[in-house]
Amino acid sequence: MDDCWRRILRTNLSRRIIQECSELPPANVETAAAAGTPAGGETPAAPSRRSLRGLDWFVFFVADVQTGFGPFVSVYLTTQRWTQVDIGLVLSAAGFVSLIGQMPGGALVDKARSERFVAGIAVATICISALTYAALPIFPTVLAGSILHAAASCVLGPAIAAISLGLVGHAVIGDRLGRNARFASIGNGLAAAAMGATGYFLSARAVFIVTVLLLIPALLALRAIAENEIDPERAHGAPPRHLSAKARARPGALMNNRPLLIFAGCLLLFHLANSAMLPLVGSVVTMKSARWATLIIAACIVVPQIVVAAMSPWIGARAQIWGRRPLLIIAFAALPIRGLLFVVISDPTILVAVQILDGITAAVFAVMVPLVVADLTRGTGRFNLGQGILGTATGTGASLSATLAGYLTDRFGSAAAFSSLAAVAFVGLTLVWLLMPETRPAKEAAT
């Protein structure tokens, strides 16, 4: 009897220590493994601490380069005496590839048997792209480098989500995605600061050397993730191995997935309203106070990153308790409020404070988008293709946003533009409220 009590006390103490030493509760994963009967017949996940830490640092180091070098490309090519037309062509080509490559990139990850290998190839491709910019800044090579970078980014995002799902499984994927978002936000901010300082103190060319240096530890972190701990079926949202291969959905079947298409439409409207909002604020601030415009816009970018880093793990945990729908409604509701506040507020300090709302939506989306896709594609084997569909909707909305905002501003003024963008955001909120169902499986509700 005494031995029994000692074993119980040791078990409870061990679990408590593990929970207190990690923000992503590994006890959840271990409990799922011990239970042996997870919802949906999924193989229990029991990733090692080394693999989880490796994923943390991989996300940290690739965060800033995953979506592009941003304004650094324009600055660098301008110093190389490129015309604005040529710079625009390069950026437009990259944007076009990024838009059309979302679904093929997701489908490629679904076909892969090693998500870690795919992620490594994507990182190596971005390294080559950065070296191309630095070594040979002529139009053909820079164009090829920008296309390679855009294509690699289309694969890298789904690959990170697939590795995460393959490691921890559906039961605690919300916690894992929250942790990913935190490390990505911190990595994004620090890498941008490092690149900016490098460009200022050294040269614009040196920014791309820094990019390569950041990607070397990213590859080392990726290597720390144990390949045998990433379940390929789980990473694709596939049916359990004991079921027939026919249970895997055809790629076209996702186009009949009504909740997924509703969510894609809502995301398109959200980004149609959101993407041009901060640049429009920048234009308004510059006209009113050109001296402080750069500092104000920098603060408007940093504040949401801080909010994302602080809130993302909490959102991942709340998603398991509240469900997905309440958090999505909060995120969609924040955007029209933000747009209307920009109409009536001119004080720079308050403008920066309003960006807290942007941080809330960014934190929710960083967790909820892949999480909802994981819910809706579970058992289909098309998790990453589902991410690609939503990525295409997001990119379409974002690409149209600047044109819409620019037209409205030129014709009717900035107040009308902000009001119109807020109205578009409200339509997206209405669709989420009326049409978007709760996607959290009932068996995964927190107890």
PLM region spans:
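Helix-loop boundary and gating motifs at the non-cytosolic
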Residues: 45-95, 261-262, 266, 271-285
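Structural signature of the two symmetry-related core transmembrane helices
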Residues: 117-131, 212, 326-341
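Cytoplasmic helix-loop-helix junction between adjacent transmembrane helices
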Residues: 147-184, 372
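Symmetry-related core transmembrane helices of the 12-TM Major Facilitator Superfamily/SLC fold
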Residues: 206-223, 418-433
